[in-house]
Amino acid sequence: GKIHVLVGKSGSGKTTTAQVLMGLVPPTSGQVNLLSDGASLDLREVELNSWWRQLTWVSQHPAILPGSVRQYLLSAGACSQAELEKAAQVTGFDAVVAALPQGWDTQLGQGGVGLSVGQRQRLALTRALVNPSALVLLDEPSAHLDAISENQIVQAVLQLRAAGSTVVVIAHRQAL
C-alpha cells in the first residue's frame, strides 16, 4: 500500500478531493483514473456500488448506527474477537471499551451517542483496521485527539498500508 497526505487550509478543497475520489462529485476538469490489474480505468466508467465496496471513508464525524460496539465493528466484515481486540489496541479504542459498562456489547445510540467525537473517530478507524479496503480515506483523523492518540493514528495508518491499502490522509497541519 501507499500513504498520501493532503494538507491545506480550511476551504482549500481537501474534502472535495476525497469526494471526487469516492465518486460522489464529478471533477471540475480532467478525470480520475483507477488502476485495476495494471489497466487504467476512468472512474466514470466504474459501477459506483462496486467502487464503494473497495473503499473506506473515516470522516471527522463518523456515522455510527445504533447497536453494540461489536456489531458496528463486525459490519465491516467477519473477524475474530482477537482481531477486534488487536485493531482496538492499535487505535487506542481498547481503553474506551474497557471503560464501557458492557464492554464490546455496550449499546450505542444513533450517531454514537455515549461516545465523545474522538472516541467515535477511534471506533471508525478501528472498523477500518478490522477489514482493510483497497482505499482508505481519513478526514482529519486526529482532529479530536491528543498528541499520544495521534501516535496511535500513525500506527493505524502504517498498519493499513502494510495490509495493502492505499491511505489518503486529509489534514490541516503536517504534524500527523
For each predicted feature, which ranges?
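Conserved Q-loop
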Residues: 61-67, 77-78
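ABC nucleotide-binding domain signature
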Residues: 5, 49, 53-60, 168
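ABC ATPase NBD Q-loop/coupling interface
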Residues: 26, 31-53
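ABC ATPase nucleotide-binding domain helical subdomain, centered on the C-loop/LSGGQ "ABC signature"
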Residues: 31-37, 70-110, 154-155, 159
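ABC-family ATPase nucleotide-binding domain "signature/switch" substructure
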Residues: 16, 56, 72, 106-176
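The feature captures the beta-strand-to-loop junction immediately N-terminal to the Walker
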Residues: 7-9
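ATP-binding Walker
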Residues: 12
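Helix-to-loop junction immediately C-terminal to a conserved catalytic motif
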Residues: 22
